């Protein structure tokens, strides 16, 4: 089965073709970072218009690189939510329209299910069940995964997502957009121990997260200290350390609560090298395993949508002809396969 995947939930246009026997045949990605940089964040209207311009050319390029024609495809998968409603409607409209004109089945894919299943694209893919930490600019949640569609949310952010906290703190430090990766780069020059940030919501039971207070703590720390390069690096290190420690503490709790030994980390923040280092160390101590997507599949991409959509289409999940987008779509409302 060969599936065309389309991802347009935010500020990246992703298109890919996945074959259930040969694996990933092609993968195209266009980032809108430069388009939104002057605004310091994603402008929904600009994002939608750019998806309109880029999606069809990327589909043509993906087919060309895979050496395929539309007649060689078995289905189309598109991100239907959660995300920016205008951006989602672009991908959904194109996906449904092409499916109708090419005589193919189409399926709407949950964006976070795509992230959760992204490690399945790797040679060393995790077996079910596992605990998944989905950590990105828009979401931070802990999920117990028994199978595809069998998701129980164990905890989630009550305010800012981890990636959002990274970007907002980077902005406070005067770093360019998108600031999260730049803050992490600056933290590499930082000194451990000079500043101590709190580990929010780790002093009480539960698996929910809160990162807005860290942003406020960072703002106060920045104002109270000199603006030299080393101080900035030390603050960046302390902030990143606090976020990662908090995530690690919650992961350890989730694994203990569920009795599972496999941990999946996915979403944009899963590309963070310090996070990978610390959670890798944690799982070694716990005699467990940790799984990540390759770095290029941590951010939004069409490959994860093609893979997730393939699983749904194999299960005979088809959508009606209407074009629908779901800006808010709880992942635990998805249907398990074959149920």
Swiss-Prot record:
Phylogenetic placement of the source organism: Bacteria, Pseudomonadati, Pseudomonadota, Gammaproteobacteria, Vibrionales
EC number per UniProt: 2.3.1.234
Residues annotated as binding Fe cation: 111, 115, 300
Keywords: Acyltransferase, Cytoplasm, Iron, Metal-binding, Transferase, tRNA processing
Gene for this chain: tsaD
Cofactor binding summary note: Binds 1 Fe(2+) ion per subunit.
Disulphide bridges: none
Family matches, as Pfam families: TsaD
Location within or outside the cell: Cytoplasm
Protein name in UniProt: tRNA N6-adenosine threonylcarbamoyltransferase
GO cellular component: cytoplasm
GO molecular function: iron ion binding; N(6)-L-threonylcarbamoyladenine synthase activity
């Amino acid at each position: 089965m060969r599936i065309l995947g389309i991802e347009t939930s935010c500020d990246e246009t992703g298109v890919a073709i996945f074959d259930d026997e040969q694996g990933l045949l092609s993968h195209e990605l266009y980032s809108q970072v430069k388009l939104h940089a002057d605004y310091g964040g994603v402008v929904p209207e600009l994002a939608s218009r750019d998806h309109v311009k880029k999606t069809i050319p990327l589909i043509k390029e993906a087919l060309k690189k895979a050496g395929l024609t539309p007649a060689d495809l078995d289905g189309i998968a598109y991100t239907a939510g959660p995300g920016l409603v205008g951006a989602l409607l672009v991908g959904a409209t194109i996906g449904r329209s092409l499916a109708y004109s090419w005589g193919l089945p189409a399926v709407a894919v949950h964006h976070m299910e795509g992230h959760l299943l992204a490690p399945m694209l790797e040679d060393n893919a995790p077996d079910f069940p596992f605990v998944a930490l989905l950590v990105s600019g828009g979401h931070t949640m802990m999920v117990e995964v028994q199978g595809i569609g069998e998701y129980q949310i164990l905890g989630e952010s009550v305010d800012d997502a981890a990636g959002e906290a990274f970007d907002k703190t980077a902005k406070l430090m005067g770093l360019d957009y998108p600031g999260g990766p730049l803050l992490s780069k600056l933290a590499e020059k930082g000194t451990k121990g000079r500043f101590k940030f709190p580990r929010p919501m780790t002093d009480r039971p539960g698996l929910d997260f809160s990162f807005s207070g860290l942003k406020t703590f960072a703002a106060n720390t920045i104002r109270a200290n000199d603006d030299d390069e080393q101080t900035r690096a030390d603050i960046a290190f302390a902030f990143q350390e606090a976020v990662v420690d908090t995530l690690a503490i919650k992961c350890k709790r989730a694994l203990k609560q569920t009795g599972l030994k496999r941990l999946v980390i996915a979403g944009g923040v899963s590309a963070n090298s310090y996070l990978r280092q610390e959670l890798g160390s944690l799982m070694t101590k716990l005699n467990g395993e940790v799984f990540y997507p390759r770095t290029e599949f941590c951010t939004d991409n069409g490959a994860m949508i093609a893979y997730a959509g393939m699983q749904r289409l194999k299960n005979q999940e088809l959508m009606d002809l209407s074009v629908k987008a779901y800006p808010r779509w709880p992942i635990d409302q998805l249907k398990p396969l074959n149920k």
